[in-house]
Amino acid sequence: MKHADLKQNFEVTGKSARDFIRWAAEKGVKVHDATISRHLSGKQGITEPWALAYLYFFSDF
């Protein structure tokens, strides 16, 4: 997953970074705003575990 794909997923679904943070917290995972910002800007690559988490979040399982 590239940062452009991530941006598009947020736009298409109407979900926000805050929604992702709340969703992760419900699963017992702490996520920082800065991490998502770096992913969205392309300053930090999106590793496979992050990509899976984002895909799971956007898929609404």
Describe each PLM feature range:
Residues 1-24:
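A short, Lys/Arg-rich alpha-helix, primarily the initiator
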Residues 3, 8, 43-51:
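Extended, non-core accessory segments
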Residues 17, 33, 51:
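Helix-turn-helix DNA-binding elements, focusing on the entry/boundary residues of the two helices
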Residues 26-45:
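Recognition helix of helix-turn-helix/homeodomain-like DNA-binding domains
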Residues 48-61:
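DNA major-groove recognition helix of helix-turn-helix/homeodomain DNA-binding modules
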